[in-house]
């Protein structure tokens, strides 16, 4: 019988595995779980942006099968794979036999606990209840046929793994390596997810996980960890995401490294101009007015203004996240050239090549709001895999947002001047968030989006959610936010792009021929006959793969709605 490739065969391996061998063992998990923008030399990899396309933040020209209710019952699923867990259990059951020193064994065991927690968390988000395994299994192990453990059991076990990781590892010394700091950051993220998942479904245990999130974030905010928001240059938010090395950066807790000079580059600055992604109008509208601090629904500054003018009136992070079509050729990829000739009609909209078949030329954006975040002009080259900009995995800004949200949900002090308002100051805003609404009252659009928030902190929680969406745009977290808040209805809202009045008459004449316009907004999906928003309750989880149930009927019952 063939043995699994990721299981150490020799009974003597662990007795001779020194610190270097333990490190090499841990290294195999980084490309599997620390994804960043994708693994080096992967064509078209932009993982954070692709994940945000599952949400209401970013639209692409492809189908969103989850939001459209088109994902079918699957027979197999690559995420129902247990090789990572098997590898983690192999290490945890044997590493104490290593002759390495205690500090090395503790560090690498902590890394493995981190990876086990992360892989299991990804499985819980996708499937809910899953089997919990504590030892490496063989083809004859009876545990292969056990049923699924409850979400409650699995999440408690994940929390145990994270606590062990925090206990065993030292503080960060290498920004590209898992540390105590990274384990605290993952703990804060995981516990915020689970606490709010339970809270907005009236399930027991929500306060426990929210408290863990609040405390983990608070620990990282202590001065001895040395974190602060990056605030260099006149566009610090934009500049944060185009750096080749995060060593010494006060905001980055963990990053994924790339280096084109050693054939470990990525393609994001080359691919982004060709990707046809675009920020949604719904996301655009959550950026507050820079002059008044008011939302678009309450501010007269923006009435009858084109999108390009609106951009300059908003929270400065907007124009550090997307680019303005009014900037013309100074905006990095509004115009594309084929055979020495500009093609397409209006800039900033996915357009059509002149020719015999009218095929779409995907050179710009679905919505008119081209994404500038992560784009480094110095890396915009025709050659592939020449990008060396590193990818933040955890950053201090998220920790501040977790502290504020968990605190507000618990009724604790969200420490606004140490959390949300630090983010606003870094952005260059002069208006700060307070616990009570302004004289103009609450934003009716936010109340409509989040009607389930109740209690004295309802306004504050809604505004923290706004801040989270703005600050963490295109970082792969919005879809999980929608899941945990039980807000799948947001994916059923109309999918609008930019205002059509930001185009000239000539451009608009071209656009109306190719891109639907409704109530003054570009509607990028209205030409798709398969576009029917239909996110329902079953879509909060995926089905258990049918092939797995055939092999192990104890995995039943199937997830709700997938029977």
Which residues does each PLM region occupy?
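Long, intrinsically disordered, low-complexity segments
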Residues: 1, 81-82, 157, 237-293, ...
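Short coil/turn linking the two alpha-helices of tandem helical-hairpin repeats
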Residues: 124-126, 131, 173, 193-202, ...
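Membrane-proximal, proline-rich intrinsically disordered regions
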Residues: 1-42, 549-563
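Conserved, well-structured interaction surfaces
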Residues: 14, 18-27, 31-35, 59-127, ...
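Extended ligand-binding clefts on enzyme/binding-domain cores
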Residues: 228-359
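C-terminal substrate/ligand-recognition segments
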Residues: 316-425
């Amino acid at each position: 019988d063939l043995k699994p490739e990721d299981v150490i065969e020799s009974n003597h391996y662990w007795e001779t595995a020194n610190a270097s061998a333990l490190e090499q063992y841990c290294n195999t998990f980084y490309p599997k779980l620390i994804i960043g923008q994708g693994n080096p030399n992967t064509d078209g990899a932009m993982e954070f942006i692709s994940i945000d396309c599952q949400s209401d933040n970013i639209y692409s020209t492809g189908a969103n099968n989850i939001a459209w209710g088109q994902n079918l019952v699957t027979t197999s699923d690559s995420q129902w794979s247990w090789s990572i867990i098997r590898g983690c259990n192999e290490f945890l059951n044997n590493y104490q036999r290593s002759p390495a020193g205690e500090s090395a064994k503790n560090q690498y065991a902590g890394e493995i606990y981190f990876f086990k927690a992360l892989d299991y968390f990804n499985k819980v988000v996708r499937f809910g209840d899953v089997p919990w395994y504590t030892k490496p299994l063989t083809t004859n192990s009876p545990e292969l046929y056990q049923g699924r453990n409850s979400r409650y059991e699995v999440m408690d076990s994940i929390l145990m793994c994270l606590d062990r990781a925090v206990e065993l590892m030292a503080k960060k010394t290498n920004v590209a390596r898992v540390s105590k700091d990274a384990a605290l950051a993952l703990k804060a993220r995981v516990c915020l997810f689970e606490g709010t998942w339970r809270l907005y479904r009236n399930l027991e245990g929500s306060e426990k996980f929210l408290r863990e999130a609040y405390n983990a974030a608070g620990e990282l905010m202590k001065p001895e960890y040395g974190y602060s928001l990056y605030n260099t240059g006149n566009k610090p938010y934009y500049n944060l995401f185009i750096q080749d090395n995060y060593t010494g950066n006060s905001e980055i807790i963990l990053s994924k490294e790339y280096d084109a000079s050693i054939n470990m580059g990525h393609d994001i600055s080359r691919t982004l101009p060709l990707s046809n992604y675009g920020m949604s109008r719904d996301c655009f509208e959550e950026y507050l007015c820079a002059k008044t601090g008011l939302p678009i629904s309450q501010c007269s500054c923006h009435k009858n203004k084109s999108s390009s003018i609106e951009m300059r009136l908003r929270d400065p992070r907007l124009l550090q996240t997307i680019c303005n079509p009014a900037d013309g050729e100074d905006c990095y990829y509004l115009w594309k050239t084929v055979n020495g000739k500009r093609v397409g009609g209006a800039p900033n909209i996915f357009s059509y090549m002149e020719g015999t078949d009218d095929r779409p030329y995907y050179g710009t954006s679905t919505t008119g709001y081209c994404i500038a975040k992560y784009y480094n002009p110095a890396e915009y080259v025709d050659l592939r895999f020449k990008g060396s900009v590193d990818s933040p995995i955890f950053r201090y800004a998220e920790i501040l947002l977790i502290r504020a949200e968990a605190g507000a949900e618990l009724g604790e002090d969200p420490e606004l001047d140490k959390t949300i308002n630090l983010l606003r100051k870094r952005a260059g805003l002069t208006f700060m968030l307070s616990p009570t609404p302004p004289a103009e009252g609450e934003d009716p659009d936010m109340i409509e989006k989040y009607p389930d928030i109740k209690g004295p902190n309802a306004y504050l929680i809604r505004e923290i959610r706004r801040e989270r969406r703005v600050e963490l745009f295109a970082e792969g977290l919005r879809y999980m936010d929608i899941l945990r808040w039980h807000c799948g209805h947001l994916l059923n809202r109309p999918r609008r792009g930019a205002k059509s009045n930001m185009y000239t008459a000539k451009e608009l004449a071209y656009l109306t021929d190719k891109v639907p316009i409704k109530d003054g907004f570009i509607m990028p999906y209205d030409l798709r006959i398969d576009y029917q928003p239909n996110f329902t309750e079953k879509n909060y989880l995926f089905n258990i793969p049918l092939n797995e149930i055939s092999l192990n009927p104890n995995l039943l019952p199937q997830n709700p709605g997938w029977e």
